[in-house]
Amino acid sequence: MFPMVTEFMNYGQQTVRAARYIGQGFIITLSHANRLPVTIQYPYEKLITSERFRGRIHFEFDKCIACEVCVRVCPIDLPVVDWKLETDIRKKRLLNYSIDFGICIFCGNCVEYCPTNCLSMTEEYELSTYDRHELNYNQIALGRLPMSIIDDYTIRTIFNLPEIKT
């Protein structure tokens, strides 16, 4: 009879422990019920990116002096800079500048180390295409300013997402 009583007490302790674990899980579930949703409905709602967001690179052709610092600091030697040396004035003249965003890792080194600030990061992050060759941007495509999300009246912009408290 004694082992039967201990088994019954063990069963009672296990039942209480299981109820406690279920209760803890239920409390955690209920604590998440009053939080705001973290996800957004993407094509119809867009987030306003932060000030230091690393999006598509914007290039200003007139400011570039063809020094190739951007190529030297790039971890994958990505920017292609074509220039011609003008012998009469002993300066380089930029002919072509291109970046392939299919390969770019958006590290921002080229923007940071450019001595003339002809490169800058934009807030544009929608670069997807059906053909990878369309991601190779020349100086004309790089010089195009992105359309602002705030100006598009068909898209609801979300300024702040609720922060997750840990």
From Swiss-Prot:
Primary residence: plastid
Protein name: NAD(P)H-quinone oxidoreductase subunit I, chloroplastic
Annotated localization: Plastid, Chloroplast thylakoid membrane
Protein source organism: Calea megacephala
Function: NDH shuttles electrons from NAD(P)H:plastoquinone, via FMN and iron-sulfur (Fe-S) centers, to quinones in the photosynthetic chain and possibly in a chloroplast respiratory chain. The immediate electron acceptor for the enzyme in this species is believed to be plastoquinone. Couples the redox reaction to proton translocation, and thus conserves the redox energy in a proton gradient.
Residues annotated for [4Fe-4S] cluster 1 binding in this entry: C64, C67, C70, C114
GO biological process, one term: photosynthesis, light reaction
Cofactor binding note from Swiss-Prot or TrEMBL: Binds 2 [4Fe-4S] clusters per subunit.
Entries under InterPro entries matching the protein: 4Fe4S_Fe-S-bd, 4Fe4S_Fe_S_CS, NADH_quinone_OxRdtase_chainI, NDHI
Translocase in keyword set: yes
Domain of life: Eukaryota
Recorded topology in the membrane: Peripheral membrane protein
